[in-house]
Amino acid sequence: MIPLSVRVPASTANVGPGFDSVGIALSLYLDVVVKEKADKWQVIHSFEESIPTDDKNLIVSTACKVCPSISPHIIEVTSNIPLTRGLGSSASAIVAGIELANQLGNLNLTADQKVQIATNFEGHPDNVAASILGGTVIGALDGKDISVVRIESKELGVISLIPNEELNTDESRSVLPKMFPFHEAVKASAISNVLVAALCQKRWEVVGEMMERDHFHEPYRLELVPLLPSIRKCAKEFGAYGTALSGAGPSIFILTPYEKRQEIAEQLARVFTDMKVCELEIDHKGIIVNKEEHIGS
C-alpha cells in the first residue's frame, strides 16, 4: 500500500515581461512516494548520479528545514520535468519538500503559507506559486511581503521547445545588467502591466504581443538562446499567440489557442528537429496529495 504520495507540476516563469512575477503551472510532474520509516533518509531515483540520494537531496533538505522534527523515511522520486531547462525543476523539488514536511509533520499549512515558505527558499514567487496553486499566477515580493493572485487560463494551449543543452540559472542571470535606466524601467513596467491586464481579461492576442516585447531580461539572454527569434517568427506564422523564454531558458515557451496546439506543435517539430517539441497543457490543480493512511512524524 502506498501511504502517501505528492505530485507537483512543472512551471514556466516570466512569460516575457513578467520577470520574477508571472508563472504558469504546466502538465509535467514531479512525483514523490513516501515509503516506510528508516534510520536515515533514502531517496530512490533514476536521475543522474549528481542528484543526492540522502538528506542532501533538495526535497529532503527542504522538508527538514521546514520541520526539523520529522522522522527519516525512504522516498521514491520520479519526474518528467527536464532539469536545468527553465521549467521549474528546482522549484518543484522545493514545493515537494514543503508538502512532505506538511504531511509528515502534520503542520496543516495553508496554500498561502506554502507560497510564503517556498518564496523564501526560491527568492521569487513565480515558479513556486504556480506549482502550489496551479493555473496562472502573478506574484510580488517586497521585502518580507508576498502577494500572489491566481487566474484561470483554460482557453490556452502550451508548447515547449526543449533543447538538448542545459543552461544553469546562475549563468543565465549573470548576463543581466546590474543597473537599469529609469526610462527603460518605466517602459518595461508598462509592458508588463498590459500583459497582466490582458491575461486577466483573456485578450490572448494582446498577451502574445506583450510576451514578445520584454525589456527586462530577454534582450540580454539572446546570446545564450540564439534560436529564440526564429522560433518566435515560425510560431507566429503557424498561429501561436506569442513566444518567450521559459524562465531563464534555454527552453522556449509558446502560448497557442487550445484547439490549435497539436497542429502548431507538429509544424514546429518539422522545422526545429534538434529540439524536443512538447505539446503541454496548463495544470490547474497545483499540488496533489494522495493519502491511504495517516503517517505521523
UniProtKB/Swiss-Prot annotation:
Q: Where in the cell is it found?
A: Cytoplasm
Q: Which reaction does it catalyse?
A: L-homoserine + ATP = O-phospho-L-homoserine + ADP + H(+)
Entry-linked PANTHER family: HOMOSERINE KINASE, HOMOSERINE/4-DIPHOSPHOCYTIDYL-2-C-METHYL-D-ERYTHRITOL KINASE
Q: Give the family from UniProt.
A: Belongs to the GHMP kinase family. Homoserine kinase subfamily.
Per the record, the pathway is: Amino-acid biosynthesis; L-threonine biosynthesis; L-threonine from L-aspartate: step 4/5
Q: What is its main location?
A: cytoplasm
Entries under Gene3D superfamilies matching the protein? 3.30.230.10, GHMP kinase, C-terminal domain (3.30.70.890)
> What's its top-level EC category?
transferase
Q: Which InterPro entries match?
A: GHMP_kinase_C_dom, GHMP_kinase_C_sf, GHMP_kinase_N_dom, GHMP_knse_ATP-bd_CS, Homoserine_kinase, Ribosomal_Su5_D2-typ_SF, Ribsml_uS5_D2-typ_fold_subgr
Q: Name one GO cellular component term.
A: cytoplasm
By which gene is this protein encoded?
Answer: thrB
Q: What does this protein do?
A: Catalyzes the ATP-dependent phosphorylation of L-homoserine to L-homoserine phosphate.
Organism, as annotated: Bacillus cereus (strain ATCC 14579 / DSM 31 / CCUG 7414 / JCM 2152 / NBRC 15305 / NCIMB 9373 / NCTC 2599 / NRRL B-3711)
Protein name in the entry: Homoserine kinase
One of the entry's Gene Ontology molecular-function terms is:
ATP binding
Transport in keyword set: no
Source superkingdom: Bacteria
Under HAMAP family, the record lists: Homoser_kinase
Quote the Pfam families the UniProt record gives: GHMP_kinases_C, GHMP_kinases_N
Provide the alphabetized UniProt keywords: Amino-acid biosynthesis, ATP-binding, Cytoplasm, Kinase, Nucleotide-binding, Threonine biosynthesis, Transferase
Q: What Gene Ontology terms for biological process does this UniProt record contain?
A: threonine biosynthetic process
Record-listed ATP binding positions: 82-92
EC no. given is: 2.7.1.39
